[in-house]
């Protein structure tokens, strides 16, 4: 659970069993969550004031103002300098792990109580003041100095440091702040969404609680801009990685054993042969030096000795070759060096090999085992930030399918439970989301607030997709067979037919330029099935427009489709209108419903359907009630469609508009709609 960091509010990220995927729209907090995990686990010294939830600095500055007030009191009550004042506003991370009885030796230094035997064990990492009294004294002294400098000036002085507590800490954050670790009470695990409070009596532990327990590895996105994260956590080409792998796991000159003797003998023979060749090649040059009486008497004789290092053989562009065409012999095989291969494939190979390196370093494969004195950590966490930054769309799905299997491809891993691997990926790729079990998705939802700095919370979609009812099955099938960009959209439009799918993007581009610049997911739901996506839409909290047909039927005539009319007791057959919003069935009510009544109670979902429209027909103003989206479009553009030449539905609409009476016009249009709807269903 991550709390109060960057643009995040309270983030509850229950990890999936093997891999967890962070999804969400742009600027929803995915990268902030990944970076904060890196800060807490790996780069504690890299915290900045920007890593606090920005809206909390108002409250932190109030703490600074209180300190100024306290400093003017004659007798300071030190109880006012309490860590509890800071607790709600500083970044913190709660880590919960499940410990079996046979694993207690890994956690013997962080056991919460004497009677704890196994089960949940929690650690809170909190970035907080080291010593509040020191912070109080130094801050109030700095402010007092500024007051003394400016109090006699007749004009307002230039703003001097520190303006407020944030300004003070921007320069000296790590002088006064550190990451402390606390043991949590396992009996309070899962009691609501509010993190358990720590009392003033809770004392931080004075060691790294995760040393020997968790191994962390990272692949950053490397966006090409100045990246605050360490550069070595990105990807490099395969040649560079092979050199690093060789040095750690293979190098025969390190911690020599019997298997290295043949290699060392070959290196020695190569050194001798090279020495002889160099001595012969440089002999005339060295003789010239001797004729200068140098080295001379008492000076050392010059000789040449080489040292062949196998890893040097990997320090060139063609260290890694790809066979592009096989030959009858090895010499006839056509090869290209790594840099001439496709960039997407290069990056895929490099990223997969980096995962292999992470796994083998964790499992201490090869020489690294002899150079290490500590046990293998039982938990391996790999953080991969936006792999699509390196990979083309075609290989993104290959990566996500293979990544976890690669991390477990070791004799001590596979399906065994002794060591656990947790792969955490942040992504903005619908291709990657498509390949994942939706239960592994964690959706970052931007909170919609007015006059406040925006924050995000995280929705655990394992609850949304965990059930096996028909609604959930439909949502899974629909997203799998179409696309998953709903998880990354700023808003969604749910439509029913092909006409809407073709025309809506055109309408948006022509009439709504602001919408055109937003990331809107257009989802075509065949028939009136939009309501089946309601649980997902509600959980995502995404702004949604549903365009549906009113679909009027006569309940007294075997629910036969009829043209919408008032006073006939007709009802809608649309499940969206009946079960979602506005949750009404009567056509009489629906066609007269106020616009404000066509949205959900939280204002995030709005439904649009046909209603009464005044048109001029044969010089008379009449009110008509369209049956479909297409009909409504025609009635809004009568002159255009009346003269339009075409086939099929367009021809039928044109003929209907040229009828002599409105009654006959509506009859023919309705027949055309029914025929079109039937043909579309058959297709």
Tell what function each PLM region has.
Residues 2, 7-15, 676-682:
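Conserved small/polar residues in nucleotide/adenosyl-binding loops
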Residues 13-17, 374-376:
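Phosphate-binding P-loop
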Residues 19-62, 341-358, 397, 401-402, ...:
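Phosphate-binding glycine-rich loops of NTP-binding sites
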Residues 42-74, 359-377, 409-420, 451, ...:
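Flexible phosphate/Mg2+-sensing switch loops adjacent to catalytic phosphate-binding sites
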Residues 51, 55-57, 62, 67-92, ...:
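Glycine-rich phosphate-binding loops of NTPases
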Residues 208, 476-494, 498-683:
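Acidic, Mg2+-coordinating catalytic modules of nucleic-acid enzymes
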Residues 221-384, 405, 409-411:
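Extended helical coiled-coil dimerization/tether regions that scaffold
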Residues 398-492, 499-513, 539, 560-578:
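C-terminal lobe/lid and adjacent interdomain/linker elements of RecA-like ASCE P-loop ATPase modules
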């Amino acid at each position: 659970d991550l709390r109060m960091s960057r643009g995040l509010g309270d983030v509850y990220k229950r990890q999936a069993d093997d891999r967890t995927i962070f999804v969400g729209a742009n600027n929803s907090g995915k990268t902030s969550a990944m970076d904060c995990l890196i800060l807490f686990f790996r780069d504690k010294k890299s915290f900045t004031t920007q890593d606090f939830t920005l809206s909390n600095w108002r409250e932190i500055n109030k703490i600074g103002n209180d300190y100024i007030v306290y400093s003017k009191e004659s007798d300071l009550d030190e109880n006012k300098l309490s860590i509890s004042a800071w607790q709600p506003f500083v970044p913190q991370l709660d880590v919960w792990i499940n410990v079996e009885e046979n694993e207690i030796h890994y956690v013997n230094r962080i056991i919460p109580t004497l009677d704890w035997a196994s089960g949940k064990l929690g650690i809170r990492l909190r970035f907080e003041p080291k010593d509040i009294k020191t912070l109080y004294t130094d801050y109030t002294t700095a402010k007092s100095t500024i007051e003394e400098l400016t109090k006699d000036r007749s004009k307002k002085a230039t703003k001097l440091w520190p303006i407020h507590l944030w300004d003070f800490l921007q320069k000296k954050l790590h002088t006064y702040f550190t990451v402390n670790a606390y043991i949590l009470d396992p009996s309070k695990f899962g009691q609501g969404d509010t993190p358990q409070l720590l009392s003033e009596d809770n004392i931080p532990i004075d060691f790294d609680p995760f040393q020997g327990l968790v191994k962390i590895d990272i692949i950053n996105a490397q966006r090409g801009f100045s990246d605050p994260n360490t550069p070595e956590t990105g990807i490099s080409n395969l040649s560079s990685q092979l050199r690093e792998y060789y040095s750690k796991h293979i190098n025969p000159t390190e911690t020599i054993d019997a298997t290295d003797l043949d290699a060392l003998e070959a290196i020695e023979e190569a050194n001798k042969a090279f020495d002889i060749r160099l001595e012969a090649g440089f002999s005339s040059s060295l003789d010239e030096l001797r004729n200068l009486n140098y080295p001379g008497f008492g000076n050392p004789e010059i000789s040449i000795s080489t040292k062949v290092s196998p890893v040097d053989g990997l320090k060139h562009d063609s260290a890694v070759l790809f066979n592009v065409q096989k030959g009858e012999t090895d010499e006839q095989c056509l090869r290209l060096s790594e840099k001439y291969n496709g960039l997407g494939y290069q990056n895929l190979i490099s990223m997969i090999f980096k995962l292999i390196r992470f796994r083998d370093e964790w499992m201490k494969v090869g020489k690294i085992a002899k150079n290490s004195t500590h046990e293998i950590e039982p938990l391996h966490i790999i953080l991969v930030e936006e792999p699509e930054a390196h990979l083309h769309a075609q290989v993104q799905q290959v990566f996500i399918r293979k990544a976890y299997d690669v991390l477990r491809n070791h004799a001590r891993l596979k399906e065994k439970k002794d060591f656990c691997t947790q792969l955490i990926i942040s992504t903005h790729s619908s291709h990657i989301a498509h390949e994942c079990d939706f239960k592994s998705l964690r959706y970052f939802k931007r909170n919609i607030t007015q006059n406040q700095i925006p924050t995000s919370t995280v929705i655990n979609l394992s609850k949304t997709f965990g059930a096996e009812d028909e609604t959930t099955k439909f949502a899974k099938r629909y997203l799998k067979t179409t696309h998953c960009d709903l998880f990354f959209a700023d808003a969604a439009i749910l439509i029913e037919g092909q006409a809407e799918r073709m025309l809506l993007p055109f309408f948006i581009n022509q009439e709504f330029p602001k919408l055109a610049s937003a990331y809107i997911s257009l989802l075509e739901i065949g028939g009136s099935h939009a309501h089946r996506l309601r649980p997902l839409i509600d959980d995502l909290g995404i702004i949604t427009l549903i365009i549906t047909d009113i679909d009027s039927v006569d309940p007294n005539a075997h629910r036969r489709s009829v043209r919408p009319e008032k006073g006939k007791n007709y009802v809608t057959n649309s499940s969206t209108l009946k079960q979602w919003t506005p949750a009404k069935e009567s056509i009489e009510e629906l066609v007269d419903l106020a616009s404000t009544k066509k949205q959900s109670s939280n204002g995030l979902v709005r439904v649009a359907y046909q209603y009464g429209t005044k048109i001029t027909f044969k010089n008379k103003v009449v009110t008509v009630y369209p049956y479909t989206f297409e009909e409504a479009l025609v009635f809004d553009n009568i002159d255009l469609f009346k003269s339009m030449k075409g086939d099929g539905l367009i021809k039928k609409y044109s003929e209907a508009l040229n009828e002599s009476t409105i009654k006959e016009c509506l009859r023919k249009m309705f027949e055309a709609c029914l025929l079109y709807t039937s043909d579309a269903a058959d297709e």
